[in-house]
């Protein structure tokens, strides 16, 4: 998630919660982003995607994730917003569940935002649904989103740092939280998601626009690996112990198979959005030029829906 320019230069454990989320209200979907797909992956069969909007989500199909929802719709998916708590009947009949920045309370500024967004029975329902063959895309940004989503991610063995992650050696511009992933810096791992179906879909450059770090289970693939220079930083007021720690060996993109299903967990949400921020309408997300975030979104969905093996 993109932070304000002031915040991006203040990565420190003492960063106040108010500063950490400054500028969120100015983030809006880019109305000029081109979501057309020249050759849709699905033209007859249309996998059903449930996009969550029932858990105080910062990103929704009609809001900041509209470009993502429109893009995958144009690729042949049937996207349906979710307005209910997760249960077996809620998930029945869907192929992919997408959850983007669910929160424990409305608004990133809320002191309760880092509380779990999901009840225990909801987490069990999602776990059982994936085990039976469903696919989950769980996206949880920097604080407070990590705390709100870790109860669910742990059902699949994925730990969340629950703070902010920066890399002084691999970043875009002057924001050390905007981490850059390329084959040259060896932070993009080989996986069906990064290979795509052919050379035209291979991922060569990703930017994550300030998120958190993840640690997947042994059988997972960290397709967006963090460098040894990456650090996790947690300011006060985020619902977890403030401090600074190495993020070496962790990731911002993890893929795994779980029972008959598949799971992708991302530690940053803006990279699959297309947003503009501030009076200068600064672009961040899939609408940034020179990056493969748009193709990454499609490849992730292709893997989750079984098009990529």
Predicted segments, located by residue:
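Bacterial N-terminal signal peptides that target proteins for export
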Residues: 2-14
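Bacterial N-terminal signal peptides
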Residues: 12-22
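Short, surface-exposed patches at the edges or C-terminal ends of soluble domains, predominantly
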Residues: 24-309
